[in-house]
A protein has these predicted regions:
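Acidic/histidine-rich
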Residues: 156-190, 464, 469-495, 537
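Generic C-terminus detector
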Residues: 258, 549, 562-564, 574-615
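Active-site phosphate/pyrophosphate-binding segments
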Residues: 265-269, 273-303, 383, 393-522, ...
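Glycine-rich phosphate-binding loops that contact phosphosugars or nucleotide phosphates
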Residues: 294-439, 443-446, 526-567, 571, ...
Length: 615
């Protein structure tokens, strides 16, 4: 949520900041703003809407020169989306400018105290409170910017990633983070600040990811100093070499990032198991698992914590771990887990799943699990993310940057990683026979080919999308391994097309949802030959008898469901446990085409953010 971009160096800042904000659009936002400093004057432009609206506003209102700049895309938390509430915010004196991602929980008493001291507020935001608090600290004790920020942040309760500029000391930007990500790109005679590395990847491959509770004094022509916010202690930061490249974060000829990412799934699944899966040798080697194998094998249970699509991947993993490795599994919404005083101990293994590695609720769940003595294993996509650093060990999905807000390739690569972990544990425990274990390795190795074949359903998905694009409601049904796929299919549709959709276990249809079925209700049924096929056929017959419109995802060559369904989409035959990797593909394509036909913003759906970094 929200995006931060900053630049201090020798180049013109405006194009760097604007391009950077566009690269962060996937994070979700409702307004944008920029501040430029030309050596004398701070020039600010803000606009409700898109970065393109900001560009128009900036050209009308300010001169766009200056080698220092900060920019922001805002996702409203305090105050409605409008120009006034957009960032950057200036202090009362006009000397300080700030951009902020996060929530200041104690902003109300801080604001009241500042009002008592004569401060006047222009916006409804918590961020304006913070910049004036910094100014008050700075004036009261005659402090330099860095020290004033440090003192002020010790009075703040909440989460933040900030960049602060002081025109009285114009060769410096101060950045700090707690609970929200912040990366600093290091170039020759220049620095870049951003919520992630995508805004500066074309300028430098070296970056420092600030840890929670750290701040950086970024000075032009001087080395950067990183300190602890709590006690001002110096920190020696690790400079990382970035793994992504510019090509990965461009559309590459596709109309939308989401479509590109759907079609990347054969290659990224292969990247996920590359070097880990050795089918011919009967081996799975994952360093994070091997180094902590006894922790997994001695666990009384596995607790999976995640949000959104990652939670659905966790549900698939629940079936896989229990069937393959015979370890009890509980799957928890991270947002609920942390607030219900869960019973956790040192015999538990907690697996935290997050594409971005920055999900606030998942981070909080990790910290709680660690406090209670559990071993915590992370499954993330973004290298160097907060969750990857906070967990005891983990595995990256290697899916590459996922820009579309609605996750696609993150889902299938998460399932791939979790399947490999379950297979490795099954081998160690002897809970799968030698032949069954090898058959799964061999099938997993050819899953990219089957995904590629499933992508050939695109034209069929487009035809069906044209029929149901105006449906007000949809129902998704699946059983066993494909119940989470039904949930994920419904989520994708509602996320990007704004059609109300619900996912249910097919057996639960008779316990309520069947009351909704009539000739106006499209029902998407995941019905592969494996698993509970006869049961799902019975469910389809029940829908048919109530005149529901049936769209079924079936195994290639199926005849029984073909006779009952109004529309079918055929996918290649796959074992029950691996079928979610295949059956989810046509549902992704259906959602995509319906959203496009409805004129929706596929990559940046309304009210949604890619990385939910606030609670």
């Amino acid at each position: 949520m929200c995006g931060i971009v900053g630049y201090i160096g020798y180049r013109e800042a405006y194009p760097i900041v604007i391009k950077g904000l566009k690269r962060l659009e996937y994070r979700g936002y409702d307004s944008a703003g920029v501040m430029l400093f030309d050596g004398k004057t701070m020039k600010v432009a803000k606009a409700k809407g898109k970065v393109s609206d900001l560009e128009e506003r900036a050209l009308q209102q300010i001169t766009i020169n200056g080698t220092i700049g900060i920019g922001h895309t805002r996702w409203a938390t305090h105050g409605v989306p409008n120009d006034v509430n957009s960032h950057p915010h200036l202090s009362n004196s006009g000397d300080l400018a700030i951009i902020h991602n996060g929530i200041i929980e104690n902003y109300a008493p801080l604001k009241a105290e500042l009002i008592n001291r004569g401060y006047v507020f222009q916006s409804d935001t918590d961020t304006e409170v913070l910049v004036n608090l910094i100014e008050e600290v700075q004036k009261k004790d005659n402090l330099k910017l860095g020290k004033a920020v440090q003192v002020a942040l010790n009075q703040v309760v909440g989460a933040y990633a900030i960049a602060v500029f002081d025109k009285k000391n114009p060769n410096e930007i101060v950045a700090a983070r707690l609970g929200s990500p912040l990366a600093i790109g290091i170039g020759e005679g220049e620095y870049f600040i951003a919520s992630d590395a995508s805004p500066f990847i074309e300028y430098t491959s070296n970056a420092v990811y600030l840890e929670d509770g750290e701040m950086a004094n970024i000075r032009l022509h001087k080395s950067m100093k990183v300190r602890k916010i709590k006690d001002d202690a110096l920190v020696n930061p690790t400079i990382q070499e970035l793994q992504m490249n510019l090509e990965q974060i461009e559309k590459g000829g596709y109309d939308h990032f989401m479509l590109k990412e759907i079609y990347e799934q054969p290659s990224v699944i292969k990247d996920t198991y590359r070097g880990r899966l050795h089918a011919n040798d009967g081996l799975i080697q994952m360093a994070g698992v091997e180094d902590n194998l006894e922790k997994f094998l001695n666990a009384d249970r596995i607790i999976i914590v995640a949000c959104g699509t990652s939670w659905h991947a966790g549900l698939v993993a629940e079936y896989i771990f229990e069937e393959f490795a015979r370890i009890p599994v509980e799957v928890e919404y991270a947002s609920e887990f942390r607030y219900r005083n869960p019973i956790i101990n040192s015999k538990d293994v907690v697996i935290a799943i997050s594409q971005s590695g920055e999900t606030a609720d998942t981070m909080a769940a990790i910290k709680l699990a660690k406090e209670k003595g559990a071993f915590v294993f992370g499954v993330c996509n973004v290298v160097g993310s907060s969750i990857s650093r906070e967990t005891h060990a983990g595995a990256y999905t290697h899916a590459g940057p996922e820009i579309g807000v609605a996750s696609t390739k993150a889902f299938t690569t998460q399932i791939t990683v979790l399947t490999m972990i379950a297979l490795r544990l099954a081998k160690a425990k002897g809970t799968l026979s030698h032949s069954v274990f090898h058959s799964y390795l061999q099938e997993l190795e050819i899953i990219p080919d089957k995904v590629r074949e499933a992508l050939e359903t695109n034209d069929r998905a487009k035809e069906i999308a044209a029929v149901f694009k105006d449906a007000p409601n949809c129902l998704y049904l699946g059983r066993g391994y494909n119940f989470p796929v039904a949930l994920e299919g419904a989520l994708k549709l509602k996320e990007i097309s704004y059609i109300h959709a619900e996912g249910y276990p097919a057996a639960e249809m008779k316990h309520g949802p069947i009351a909704l079925i009539d000739e106006q209700m499209p029902v998407f049924v995941i019905a592969p030959k494996q698993g509970h096929y006869d049961k799902i056929v019975s469910n389809i017959q029940e829908i048919k008898s109530r005149s529901g419109k049936i769209i079924a995802v079936v195994t290639k060559g199926d005849t029984q469901v073909r006779e009952l369904a109004d529309y079918i989409i055929e996918v290649p035959e796959t074992s029950d446990a691996l079928s979610p990797l295949i059956t989810t593909i046509p549902l992704q394509l259906l959602s995509y085409h319906i959203a496009v036909m409805r004129g929706c913003n596929v990559d940046q759906p309304r009210n949604l953010a890619k990385s939910v970094t606030v609670e």
